[in-house]
Amino acid sequence: MNYLPQQDPQVFATIEQERKRQHAKIELIASENFVSRAVMEAQGSVMTNKYAEGYPGRRYYGGCEYVDVVEDLARERAKQLFGAEHANVQPHSGAQANMAVYFTVLKPGDTVLGMNLSHGGHLTHGSPVNFSGVQYNFVEYGVDPETHVIDYDDVREKARLHRPKLIVAGASAYPRVIDFAKFREIADEVGAYLMVDMAHIAGLVAAGLHPNPVPYAHFVTTTTHKTLRGPRGGMILCQEQFAKQIDKSIFPGIQGGPLMHVIAAKAVALGEALQDDFKVYAKRIIDNAQRLAAALQKEGFTLVSGGTDNHLLLVDLRPQQLTGKTAEKVLDEVGITVNKNTIPYDPESPFVTSGIRIGTAAVTTRGFGLEEMDEIASLIGLVLKNIDNEQALEEARQRVVALTEKFPLYQD
């Protein structure tokens, strides 16, 4: 940074502190990742200066010839990556992508089937504190109480009973493969639209390591960060028959001017995801997650559903008589960042929780491999079994430093 230190030393110092935090800590939050320098350069470019209401070739402002090029690049790369007929890359977030789909096919009060938040769903899948739960009549489905895998018979039964206009598949804390073909079969049976929110698994889908929802869903929404390793933002993929409606729902429906610097960064990230080395990266994410799952089980921890098929795992801390809130705090104190998370049928509130959610996308980007997963599991075991033992916690801090120093992040 050449100008910020002199122009605004307070902001510069805070950014520098955050850079040091990211370098010094082991990042295990499943929704986070580290973007490339190229993505950051695009997001910090002169594209941030340009207003571009509308779509390429149909703008409400002049001077859009170059932002048109970059948005077309992003759209075409998204379509190529996921095999979609249409892509809208303007949503500012995954939540707004979901909102646009709802506005396209629903009216206030319509019935929607969505996954229970405490079973792994998302706020925008019908939580009563979210616009989705306020505007629409969401009926919840969940996971089997024994296996903690989606109960497709329950989904079918509720679909038949409530006849939803839309079924929402996808999750924010579900460690197993989702059967999109089964969801489409159920949707067709009751005459519902199917929307898949693949925000967490988009990078794995792009690499061919998780079933692709695009052939099955009428609409697919996603974020562009998480496993896709792009800038924070959203995206919608849909069939061509819905393209005009979706585009209209985004602009002028719920957004004004698109963030062209973010769209430029999305284009870069989507280009990266089309490369062969991204497939290698995505495979390593899953390998690391499964190795970490096995190592945590050896440490005596209980995993929701018994393991993982993707990038994340949920640890049930009730056998350790710990809450997610306590675990998150003590792990952060030694340099391991996780988030407290509800588990299926959780007796605790969302502010306390009985579990933690762990993901491997960020540490895999950093270069961590299977041996490092064993060390992370050992560290988590050491800390959570000795939360009041300062000597053990200090040992963990030193081991975290040793590990992070081996894999420098944004140091040049």
Swiss-Prot record:
<dbReference type="GO" id="GO:0019264">
    <property type="term" value="P:glycine biosynthetic process from serine"/>
</dbReference>
<dbReference type="GO" id="GO:0004372">
    <property type="term" value="F:glycine hydroxymethyltransferase activity"/>
</dbReference>
<feature type="binding site">
    <location>
        <begin position="121"/>
        <end position="123"/>
    </location>
    <ligand>
        <name>(6S)-5,6,7,8-tetrahydrofolate</name>
    </ligand>
</feature>
<dbReference type="InterPro" id="IPR015424">
    <property type="entry name" value="PyrdxlP-dep_Trfase"/>
</dbReference>
<dbReference type="InterPro" id="IPR019798">
    <property type="entry name" value="Ser_HO-MeTrfase_PLP_BS"/>
</dbReference>
<dbReference type="GO" id="GO:0035999">
    <property type="term" value="P:tetrahydrofolate interconversion"/>
</dbReference>
<feature type="binding site">
    <location>
        <begin position="349"/>
        <end position="351"/>
    </location>
    <ligand>
        <name>(6S)-5,6,7,8-tetrahydrofolate</name>
    </ligand>
</feature>
<comment type="pathway">
    <text>One-carbon metabolism; tetrahydrofolate interconversion.</text>
</comment>
<keyword id="KW-0963">Cytoplasm</keyword>
<keyword id="KW-0663">Pyridoxal phosphate</keyword>
<feature type="modified residue" description="N6-(pyridoxal phosphate)lysine">
    <location>
        <position position="226"/>
    </location>
</feature>
<dbReference type="GO" id="GO:0005829">
    <property type="term" value="C:cytosol"/>
</dbReference>
<dbReference type="GO" id="GO:0030170">
    <property type="term" value="F:pyridoxal phosphate binding"/>
</dbReference>
<dbReference type="InterPro" id="IPR039429">
    <property type="entry name" value="SHMT-like_dom"/>
</dbReference>
<dbReference type="Pfam" id="PF00464">
    <property type="entry name" value="SHMT"/>
</dbReference>
<dbReference type="InterPro" id="IPR001085">
    <property type="entry name" value="Ser_HO-MeTrfase"/>
</dbReference>
<protein>
    <recommendedName>
        <fullName>Serine hydroxymethyltransferase</fullName>
        <ecNumber>2.1.2.1</ecNumber>
    </recommendedName>
</protein>
<comment type="subunit">
    <text>Homodimer.</text>
</comment>
<comment type="pathway">
    <text>Amino-acid biosynthesis; glycine biosynthesis; glycine from L-serine: step 1/1.</text>
</comment>
<feature type="binding site">
    <location>
        <position position="117"/>
    </location>
    <ligand>
        <name>(6S)-5,6,7,8-tetrahydrofolate</name>
    </ligand>
</feature>
<dbReference type="InterPro" id="IPR015422">
    <property type="entry name" value="PyrdxlP-dep_Trfase_small"/>
</dbReference>
<keyword id="KW-0808">Transferase</keyword>
<dbReference type="InterPro" id="IPR049943">
    <property type="entry name" value="Ser_HO-MeTrfase-like"/>
</dbReference>
<keyword id="KW-0554">One-carbon metabolism</keyword>
<keyword id="KW-0028">Amino-acid biosynthesis</keyword>
<comment type="similarity">
    <text>Belongs to the SHMT family.</text>
</comment>
<comment type="function">
    <text>Catalyzes the reversible interconversion of serine and glycine with tetrahydrofolate (THF) serving as the one-carbon carrier. This reaction serves as the major source of one-carbon groups required for the biosynthesis of purines, thymidylate, methionine, and other important biomolecules. Also exhibits THF-independent aldolase activity toward beta-hydroxyamino acids, producing glycine and aldehydes, via a retro-aldol mechanism.</text>
</comment>
<dbReference type="InterPro" id="IPR015421">
    <property type="entry name" value="PyrdxlP-dep_Trfase_major"/>
</dbReference>
<feature type="site" description="Plays an important role in substrate specificity">
    <location>
        <position position="225"/>
    </location>
</feature>
